[in-house]
Design a protein with these regions (language model features):
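C-terminal and inter-domain tail/linker signature
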Residues: 1-135
Length: 135
């Protein structure tokens, strides 16, 4: 029973660390658009599955520089964050002028660094066929 509790405690601690790491990383990279500060959280190889960026830390750096120029007012609100082992999922509200997007980002962490990223984005319409929020 103690070994099971120890394992559960270790997993919970890992999930907490991973969620904190992704929250710091994402805020620096996307909200503050500070790649130099966000770089410390990226592994030596960063595999990008999003069509918006290239592989490698340099790919993320190029995207952040592009965002500074093309979407300078973009801000992401973290709605929920879920961790499962080496994976962290974020459900976000991406605010930009004009429009808002519902975003799901998935990150894989290895040795305390972000090494892989996927995303899915959807415009938030003015009206919907139901009264349910996308968030």
């Amino acid at each position: 029973m103690t070994a099971t509790k120890d394992l559960q405690g270790a997993r919970a601690a890992q999930a907490k660390r991973n969620k904190e790491l992704i929250t710091r990383y994402y805020d620096l990279a996307l909200n503050q658009k500070d790649f130099a500060a966000a770089r410390q959280y990226i592994g030596p190889y960063y595999r990008q599955h999003s069509t918006y960026g290239a592989d490698g830390p340099e790919g993320l750096g190029a995207f952040v520089e592009w965002a500074k120029v093309n979407i300078p007012n973009m801000h992401v609100d973290f709605v929920r964050i879920i961790a499962d082992g080496d994976y962290v999922l974020m459900h976000n509200r991406g605010k930009n002028s004009p429009g808002t997007k519902a975003v799901v980002d998935i990150f894989r962490i290895e040795n305390g660094k972000v090494v892989e990223h996927w995303d899915v984005l959807q415009d938030v319409p003015e009206t919907a066929k139901n009264a349910n929020s996308m968030f």
